[in-house]
């Protein structure tokens, strides 16, 4: 069907999928192809750049066909077939330049289904998920996608609130892995992603 087959993602099975394909893996692959194309072009290898861009385009279309869905009235994406709950990773298509469902996705992200004072829930609370677990990784991708989509006016205050909590409040001065899981352990990967929110999201400086 054109998407990437994957039985899990970086959440390592903490939240359910169909074990066949998920939105995160396909979006990360799409983004990787786009950046690989830019690298090839910068090295003068235009044939390889064209090949990777073509593959990224085809994968983007497959993501739209396979994962595109209307959930709670929002035109956004399902995470995996058979799981019609909102997930934080709906922000990834926007980060990878897939903007067909930008408006509905931003509305869903900032809705009470996902947004909390700590960031985005990994999954909306439902029979499928009863936890309020947030991962800074997906929250930071959410900030980045909102800025890249021109929705800075909507996301700036939540971003400033997040900066206050993480940089000058109870757990400083880094982004955290997850909460309540892990009791807000610090991870370098999330902190590096925070920097990318500023350089790529706010300033538009992209590789």
Residue ranges and their predicted role:
Residues 49, 56, 102-106, 152-156:
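Solenoid-repeat scaffolds in large eukaryotic assemblies
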Residues 20-31, 84-88, 133-141, 147-150, ...:
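Aromatic- and histidine-enriched alpha-helix N-cap/loop-to-helix transition segments
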Residues 23-71:
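Active-site neighborhood of glycoside hydrolase catalytic domains
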Residues 148-207:
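Non-catalytic C-terminal accessory modules of carbohydrate-active enzymes
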Residues 28-46, 91-102, 140-151, 197-206:
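Well-ordered alpha-helical scaffold segments within catalytic/enzyme domains
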Residues 1-21, 58-136, 160-177:
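Extended glycan-interaction surfaces of carbohydrate-active proteins
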